[in-house]
């Protein structure tokens, strides 16, 4: 199955990425992607865009040539209290908030500290998706984070790039996460974590993980635009009229 939704992409505003939103729209049309989120790194990353980049995201059209664009961020979990680098002005302009651990902001800690930080980030109610929770550099209590994600209605990501060129060794953890989320009745999100437009929508390896554990298709945010949009509305985000036809 070729999914039509990608929740995790980076533009050249994150200067270790290489494509514009225009590039992503063109690639989306080529691949049949009907909705994607632009989720550049939060400002505490060394080469991330300024907070104004996110505050001004209101200028991004909702629809371009039949492709829907969600305004988002991949925020950084900053400490064990679950604080993220996304202030209220930024949050007010964003449709979707991803958050995860990045070594440049939060150095890897022991399993208990990492787990506490991740759960606290979910508990605060600002984050919709936890990115690459299977990163072996940040060990966590997988069952505890899956239960917390189900409790706080947060999706855990199966990150496709983790199996290709980053976060080596994530496959075993991601399989365990998929099983734990399945058993807890929670949500998963598959993200390409694309840093160049050509990998937009590349979710095949994430899908293979879900297939291996018989993960229920109706608990995958990428299943359709409407599933993702309904999930975001269930988390308090407003209805977006421009997406009514998706």
UniProtKB/Swiss-Prot annotation:
Its cofactor is Zn(2+). Belongs to the PHP family. Zn(2+) 2 binds at residues 16, 41, 195. Keywords: Hydrolase, Metal-binding, Zinc. Binds 3 Zn(2+) ions per subunit. It comes from the Bacteria. Its EC number is 3.1.3.-. One of its GO terms (cellular component) is cytosol. This is Probable phosphatase Tola_0828. Zn(2+) 3 binds at residues 74, 102, 132.
């Amino acid at each position: 199955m070729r999914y039509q939704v990608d929740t995790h992409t980076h533009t050249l505003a994150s200067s270790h990425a290489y494509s514009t939103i225009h590039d992503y729209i063109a690639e989306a049309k080529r691949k049949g992607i009907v909705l994607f989120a632009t989720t550049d790194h939060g400002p505490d990353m060394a080469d991330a865009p300024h907070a104004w980049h996110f505050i001004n995201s209101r200028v991004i059209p909702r629809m371009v040539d039949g492709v829907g664009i969600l305004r988002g961020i991949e925020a950084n979990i900053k400490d064990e209290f679950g604080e993220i680098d996304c202030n209220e002005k930024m949050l007010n302009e964003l449709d979707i908030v991803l958050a995860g651990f990045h070594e440049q902001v939060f150095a890897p800690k022991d399993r208990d500290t990492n787990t506490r930080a991740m759960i606290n980030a979910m508990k605060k109610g600002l984050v919709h998706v936890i990115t690459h929770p299977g990163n072996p550099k940040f060990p966590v209590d997988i069952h505890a984070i899956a239960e917390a994600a189900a409790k706080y209605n947060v999706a855990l990501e199966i990150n496709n790039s983790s199996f290709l060129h980053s976060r080596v060794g994530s496959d075993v953890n991601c399989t365990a996460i998929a099983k734990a989320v399945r058993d807890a009745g929670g949500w998963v999100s598959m993200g390409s974590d694309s840093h160049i437009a050509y990998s937009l929508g590349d979710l095949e390896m994430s899908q293979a993980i879900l297939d291996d554990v018989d993960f229920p298709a109706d608990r995958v945010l990428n299943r359709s635009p409407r599933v993702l949009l309904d999930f975001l509305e269930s988390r308090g985000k407003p209805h977006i009229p421009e997406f009514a036809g998706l």
